[in-house]
Structure formats: structure tokens, C-alpha cells
Amino acid sequence: LENLFVSNKLNDFQGKRALVTGAGDGIGEMLAKNLAGAGLSVVVQDIRLEAAERVAQEIGDAATPIAFDVSDREACMIAAETIANDGPMNLLWVNAGVGVGASILKGRPNAIEWAVGVNVLGVVWTTQAFVPLMASATGPRHVGFTASSAALRKAEGSHPLYATSKHATFAFAESLSTELANEGINSTILCPGLLNTKIWDGARARPDRFGGPRFADPALSKQWDEAKSPQLMWPEIVRSIEAGGGYLTCATDNGETRQAFESRAEAIAAHIVQI
């Protein structure tokens, strides 16, 4: 693995176990492969078993695939029972997320429920199910959350439902980070910018209860196909884990994210009044 993936430190995590959700491609695949390259054994989760198996096979003996739906609390709990049989866990990365282009005012109920189910409730159910597996772990413990740079901006533009759900992802992760700290567990809130992932076609694996699979027009993929690789985030993620976590925004837009965040904060601050 050291020949395939970027070498890194994370020495205190070598020989420990990790779980990465949404690891069948994109950011999750990058995380799973690099964690394995750092000497961890990795449980590769995806809602699509074949995707999880592909990534696990490419990693080798250090990886185990598993498939379940993070928006289904019972499925998360059952999966946790299975994974617990192999021992405690030191690192959890709550990465699974879906991209939804619908508006809020006119969005279909199933699209809204799906976005909230994965990007919001999925964060809660995943942490409720798997953080208990960290209780008996020795050595450092860390939970990562993948939010989005969209969580730092006003929730508008071409993907308002997605942006809104990621604001909620960020808020839940922020609250959970305090609860985790009380348990002696560090955490990182990762906010990536636009990257070369398949998030534009997330509905290809949408469960039936949310309307079933839907395949996006490949023409929509252009801006993602031309975007930077998720791999570029890895050195920053390593630094965050080693430093004990915190906020980590990996912007890809030449300063626009910072400007949008600062403008939003200034607009809010300008209208804080004492009564």
C-alpha cells in the first residue's frame, strides 16, 4: 500500500481499526485507501455492496467491505453489532452524503426526505451506532465528519436543498464534537470544495423508499470531472488528526469560499441588536 498511496504519519493509529462511510468512491474511497496506507485496518462502507467490495479489493487484506443505508437507523445498529465482533474502533469518518439539485420551495417530498435522511439523520444514526465501539479502544480516538464548503455560505444558488442539508451536517457535527470531547474523542469537521467525485450522480443508489434509483444526465458531470482530486486533501486531513481535530475547509475556488463566509458573517453581525 505504501507504493499506492501517500505516505503519512498517524503513527499512533497504526494497527488500529477505522470505519469510513460512503467509501465506495470519491472522498470516502480516498479516505479508506489512505487510512489503510497509514497502517489501519479499514471497514469500507457504502450503500452499494459492489462499490464497497471494489475498494476493499483494491486495498487488500487491510480492508473489509460492508453495505448498509446510513439513513436507516436500524440498519446502522445491526451493522455496528456485526463490526463490533472484530473488536473496538479508533477512527470513524462520517462521510456518506448525497448531492441533490432540488429547490426547497418546489422540491419533491422524496428528494427532501432523501437529502435530510442521508446528510443529516445519517450523521446522527452513524455516530449513535458506531461511537460506542470506540469506548474500549486504547490509544487515540478520532471522528471525522464530511460536511461541505456550501455549509459556510448562504444556502442559495443552484443546489439550495443540498446546501441547506450540509448546513445541518455542519451544525450536527459541531454539536457532536462537544459531546465527543466529553468522552475524550477528538473530531474534525471537513468542508471540501468542488472536487472530482460522483456526487452529481448520487441518486443512482437512492433507496426505493425515497423514490428509487435515478440516473443523472452524464452531461452534468463536466464541472466535477474537471475538478481537483480529493487526494489533495489528505495531507491536510493528516495534520488535522494529528493536531487533535477542529475545523478544516479545503477550498478549491481561489478565495471565493472565504469571501462568501466573511460576507455572510458580516451581514449577520451587522444586525445583532441588544434588547
Where are each of the predicted segments found?
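Substrate-binding pocket helix/loop in short-chain dehydrogenase/reductase
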Residues: 103-104, 108-114
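Active-site loop of short-chain dehydrogenase/reductase
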Residues: 16, 88-90, 134-147, 182-186
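SDR active-site lid
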Residues: 178-248
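A short, exposed helix-loop element centered on a Lys and neighboring polar residues
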Residues: 127-128, 174
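The beta1-alpha1 cofactor-binding region of Rossmann-like NAD(H)/NADP(H)-dependent oxidoreductases
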Residues: 49-50, 68-78, 109
